[in-house]
Amino acid sequence: MNKFHEFDYYLKPIKIKKVLLVFLILILSNNLNFSQSLENKNILVVWGGWKGHQPKVFADNVIKWLKSQNAKITESNNLEVYDNYDSLTKFDLIIQSVTLSDISNNQADNLVKAINNGVGIAGAHGGLTDSFRTKTNYQFMIGGQFVAHPGGKVNFEVNMLNDQLTQGLNNIEIFTEQYYMHFDPNIEIIANTIFDNKFYPWIDGVIMPVAWKKKYGKGKVFYISIGHDPNEFIRYPDGWKLLTRGFIWACRN
C-alpha cells in the first residue's frame, strides 16, 4: 500500500462518519419540526364571516389546542384587528377563519404587508381561500381561491404527498366538500385529490391541491381545503395533525 492509499484507507471511516452525522442531523431537524411547540408565540386567531362554516367552532377548537401549546393568544371576531399594520407585526402567526365578508383596502393592504414582512398565516377551507373575493392582492398572497365544490358534500380521497409535514400521515377517505381551486403554480402542494366525472365530465381526472405551503416575502402561508364542518378535524385525526403541523411551520421562528 503506497502512502496515498494508506492515507485514503484511514480517511474513509472519517468520511463515512461525517455522512452519517449529516444524515442524523437531517432526521433530527425533521423530528424537531414536529416536536416544536408554539410556546410564548404571539398568535392571532381571527374568525367571522359566513356562519355556515361555523367559524367560532373552528376558532374554539384551535384556541383550545393553542392553549395546550402555551401560546400567547389574541382572539378577534371582526376585521378591525387588521386596521393597524404595526399591531399586526407583533404577531408570529395569524390563523384566520373568515368566509366571504368585506375587507377594506387598508385592512387588506396591512395584512398582506404584514405577511410579506414575516408574519405567518394559516387556515382551512373557505376561511382562508373564500375570503374577500374582490381583493386580488390577498388571493395572490394566499396562493389560491375557491371556485366550486362539485356535488356539494361527496366522498373522496385526500392523498398525502411526500413532505416533512405529511410524514407518517395516511391518505384520508373523507365525506365533505371537494374544493375546486384556482391556484398559483408557485405553491408547494403537499396533499391532493382527483376529481371524477360524476358531476362535470370535463373535470374527470383533474388533480387538485388539498393542502399547500408557500412563501410570501419573508412570511409563510399554510392552507388545507377540508373543514366545511370544523369537527372534521376531530373525526379525521390525520387532517388535524396536518393542520397543526401547518400552524407550526407557518409561524415565524
Language-model regions, residue ranges each:
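Catalytic beta-strand/loop cores that center a nucleophilic Ser/Cys/Thr
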Residues: 66-69, 90, 147-223
